[in-house]
From Swiss-Prot:
Keywords: Membrane, Signal, Transmembrane, Transmembrane helix. The lineage of its organism: Bacteria, Bacillati, Actinomycetota, Actinomycetes, Mycobacteriales. It is a single-pass membrane protein. To M.leprae ML2453. The chain crosses the membrane at residues 39-59. GO terms for cellular component: membrane. Residues 1-19 form the signal peptide. It is found in: Membrane. This is Uncharacterized protein Mb0486. Pfam families: DUF2516 (PF10724).
Amino acid sequence: MLVLLVAVLVTAVYAFVHAALQRPDAYTAADKLTKPVWLVILGAAVALASILYPVLGVLGMAMSACASGVYLVDVRPKLLEIQGKSR
């Protein structure tokens, strides 16, 4: 369980850092939620996987994995495509 928690936490932190480094106008150009909204969602995902894990347990870890997964699978490729960067 600890290995899974660390994997979800690393994924959430990676998604948060990636979202923070992108241009704000790329989110609207890709027709996705705005940058501040994604930073709040992914910040909450990091909190769920780290600070709030003792309170929410596996439910918090699952919500964190879902939020990070949606960003990495749906939003990130569109942002890279809009900005002309490779994957």
